[in-house]
Amino acid sequence: VGEGPGGLFASLRLIELGYRPIVLERGKDVRERKKDLSNITKTQKVDGESNYCFGEGGAGAYSDGKLYTRSKKRGSVDKILNVFCQHGANTNILADAHPHIGTDKLPRVIENMRNTIIKCGGEVHFQTKMIRLILESEGKLTAPDAAAGDRVIGVEAVNLATGAEETYRGPVILATGHSARDVYRYLASAKIDIEAKGIAVGVRLEHPSQLIDQIQYHNKSGRGKYLPAAEYSFVTQVDGRGVYSFCMCPGGFVIPAATGPEQLVVNGMSPSNRGTAWSNSGMVVETHPEDVAQFVKEHQSVIEQQEMKAQENASLFTPHSSLQMMYFQEIVEKQCWQQGNMKQTAPAQRMADFVNNRLSYDL
């Protein structure tokens, strides 16, 4: 369930093992997504099923295509890079220290991956949204008191274009990404074990590319004709808590990455040539569930309203819910939307003013 990076690579691995995967993707194919992304800028409205996070390729398809990680929990990076090259990515990524495909090149690569899945006997269904999991003991999981320990044997899904419901039988991989909050709500209401994890929370910094080039290359003239747009990496500890740069996009854009109405959150991306006049990077602090417990408790009435709007049972909420990090995200994103005049226009200020907790009079 989901055709982002997790779903794509899981499908390709299953094909290697002799299986024919069925991929269910709530969003549209990678080309059709472009129209909905354009509408975010034109109309300031976000399609809850097709946006910068939902659709073929997931959140990464139109947000850069950087292919490196600082995580210690990883498998064969070389194998992943080779799969990208087999599907049309530039072979430079096999040698680059920080491999990067680029937002303008990645959609074609993803399309080729989908075609491989289909040619090998798999199926890919777009605008097909999971409704519920099917359990071995009860058949259909509909009640929040379903017995724990049941084996999942399939999913029920709805075609968003036609309204038709379909049943798909077999083992299930949930590759729905971090933004499919309706999936987490469903899992919690069905009493399927989920666990809160820490997240990184922060802001996105934007600077003139030439400024970063001058600093990083120690040259007032910048990078010249032959050097790439400069990157930077920042890591430190503040009061025992990690603070670090994230998703640095030299010569790129800041983009709206909300997945529904009344939300505002941003991401960054770069085209393959990294040639724009601006560079940007996330600057985040690690945040743990215990950090937000009091905040969530203080906003319980707001959360209950959100739950009712999501057609969930608000009584399921407790201050120590496994969903508390998700609730925290939703509240902060709504507050940012309100500060952005209830549009997809991100509020901004100078970084020096932000860290000193004062208003900016200009940018």
Where are these regions (language model features)?
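Residues forming the flavin
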Residues: 1-363
